Amino acid sequence: TPGQDFMRF
């Protein structure tokens, strides 16, 4: 989901 895209790092 786009909302969890920042959790990639």
From Swiss-Prot:
Keyword list, A-Z: Amidation, Neuropeptide, Secreted
One Gene Ontology CC term in the entry: extracellular region
Compartments reported by the entry: Secreted
Phenylalanine amide: residues carrying this PTM: F9
Transmembrane helix keyword on record: no
Free-text tissue specificity from the UniProt record: In larvae, expressed in the CNS and thoracic perisymapthetic organs (tPSO) but not in the ring gland or abdominal perisymapthetic organs (aPSO) (at protein level). In adults, expressed in brain and thoracic-abdominal ganglion but not in corpora cardiaca and corpora allata (at protein level).
Major subcellular location class: secreted
GO BP annotations, alphabetical order: neuropeptide signaling pathway
Family: Belongs to the FARP (FMRFamide related peptide) family.
Known role: FMRFamides and FMRFamide-like peptides are neuropeptides.
UniProt protein name: FMRFamide-like neuropeptide TPGQDFMRF-amide
